[in-house]
Amino acid sequence: MGGWSSPSHWLIILLIVVLLFGAKKIPELAKGLGKGIKTFKDEMNNDDEVAKNTQKIEENKNTTNNTNADASIDETKKA
């Protein structure tokens, strides 16, 4: 009824994990998990940077297109 908040439940789970993987393998698994999480976070941050750079490029293209359109209007008025 208390769910998984009871310390005895966590102790049983820890015992099962130790029996399945062995005491030597657990630190290696934790290290691998930590590296995986770090890599995931780094890639998420990298995706944010790529999105920002893409947005800047699109804004620059729009500004360049508007400038070119203004220049051709000026040339048309001169002719």
UniProtKB/Swiss-Prot annotation:
One of its GO terms (cellular component) is TAT protein transport complex. The chain crosses the membrane at residues 1-21. Pfam families: TatA_B_E (PF02416). Keywords: Cell inner membrane, Cell membrane, Membrane, Protein transport, Translocation, Transmembrane, Transmembrane helix, Transport. Residues 49-61 have a biased composition (Basic and acidic residues). InterPro entries: TatA/B/E (IPR003369), TatA/E (IPR006312). The keyword Membrane applies. Belongs to the TatA/E family. NCBIfam families: tatAE. Part of the twin-arginine translocation (Tat) system that transports large folded proteins containing a characteristic twin-arginine motif in their signal peptide across membranes. TatA could form the protein-conducting channel of the Tat system. HAMAP family: TatA_E (MF_00236). This is Sec-independent protein translocase protein TatA. It comes from Campylobacter jejuni subsp. jejuni serotype O:2 (strain ATCC 700819 / NCTC 11168). The gene is tatA.
